Amino acid sequence: MSLEVFEKLEAKVQQAIDTITLLQMEIEELKEKNNSLTQEVQSAQHQREELERENNSLKEQQSGWQERLQALLGRMEEV
């Protein structure tokens, strides 16, 4: 009788070990995925910053051209 109990206990322990091993593997996969997603987020943030700088530069250029155009229109009205 005690041998049966021991075998059942051993089977449960082995099942627990197998479950723990699978969970550890899943944790490692999730860590890798998390690292990958973190890198993607950082890359997207970097691209966004670059686009914001480019946008600001283009806005400054547009403002400069608008000022020049207004100056030219003002001269044309004087003539």
UniProtKB/Swiss-Prot annotation:
Amino acid composition bias (Polar residues), ranges on this chain: 36-45
Gene Ontology cellular-component annotations: cytoplasm
InterPro entries to which the protein is assigned, alphabetical: Cell_div_ZapB
Key words, A-Z: Cell cycle, Cell division, Coiled coil, Cytoplasm, Septation
Comp. bias (Basic and acidic residues): 46-57
Principal subcellular localisation of the protein: cytoplasm
One biological process term in Gene Ontology: FtsZ-dependent cytokinesis
Top-rank lineage group of the source organism: Bacteria
Localization per record: Cytoplasm
Coiled coil, from the record: 3-79
Annotated spans, Disordered: 36-63
Function as written in the Swiss-Prot or TrEMBL entry: Non-essential, abundant cell division factor that is required for proper Z-ring formation. It is recruited early to the divisome by direct interaction with FtsZ, stimulating Z-ring assembly and thereby promoting cell division earlier in the cell cycle. Its recruitment to the Z-ring requires functional FtsA or ZipA.
Description of how the protein assembles with itself and partners: Homodimer. The ends of the coiled-coil dimer bind to each other, forming polymers. Interacts with FtsZ.
Family affiliation: Belongs to the ZapB family.
Name recorded for this polypeptide: Cell division protein ZapB
Species of the source: Salmonella typhimurium (strain LT2 / SGSC1412 / ATCC 700720)
Lineage start: Bacteria, Pseudomonadati, Pseudomonadota, Gammaproteobacteria, Enterobacterales
